[in-house]
Design a protein with these regions (language model features):
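Short histidine/acidic/glycine/proline-rich micro-motifs that form metal-
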Residues: 29, 76-78, 111
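Long, hydrophobic N-terminal alpha-helical segment
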Residues: 5-10, 17-61
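Short, conserved beta-strand segments within well-ordered enzyme catalytic domains
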Residues: 23, 69-71
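Terminal interaction module
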Residues: 5, 103-163
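Helix-adjacent hinge/juxtasegments
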Residues: 72-100
Length: 163
């Protein structure tokens, strides 16, 4: 994890590389108060998040003050749909509590001039086509599905991404 990561739950290093992963991009940076709210609610969520009657070995990260990543290591079991639904419901609740967009999958993030910028996907495609955004610009892939993908494909230049 990076130096600007806040962690709740199981340490990231103890989560298996095949663990399920979801990354949510915030429409704006989190304030210190919002970070505290996220941590508080994440602790409660992780303590009761279960799949097939067993508590999920979960790790919750606030990354670069703009992203929330959830990792779920079910230790060989498949994660039940109800557990996945609970994580989505939790993120929708956080969105309401924080007053930020987290569930908008058409919102993408890039790094420009040492700042993370979020913009609609179609706008980014247009800026790439017009060369307003270089293909060497760092892109944050919100479509990863495992810890392994997170480690290899979450942060990468646009020209090496699915864009």
């Amino acid at each position: 994890m990076t130096e600007s990561t806040i962690q709740v739950g199981v340490p990231f290093t103890e989560i298996d590389n095949e663990a399920k992963a979801w990354v949510y991009t915030s429409s704006k940076d989190f304030t210190k108060v919002q970070q505290g709210e996220i941590k508080k609610h994440a602790q409660v969520f992780l303590a009761s998040w279960d799949s097939h009657g067993k508590i999920v070995k979960g790790s919750f990260q606030i990354i670069k003050n703009r992203f929330i990543a959830i990792f779920a290591d079910t230790e060989g079991d498949t994660m039940c749909g109800r557990a996945q639904d609970r994580s989505v419901k939790f993120m929708k609740e956080l969105e309401q509590i924080l007053g930020v967009k987290l569930m908008d999958r058409m919102l993408v993030a890039i790094q420009q001039n040492d700042q993370i910028v979020t913009l609609p996907f179609v706008e980014l495609r247009s800026k790439i086509a017009s060369k307003d955004v270089s293909t060497l610009t760092l892109f944050y892939n919100g479509l990863i599905t495992s810890k392994k993908e997170f480690l290899s494909d979450w942060e990468r230049p646009i020209d090496g991404s699915w864009l």
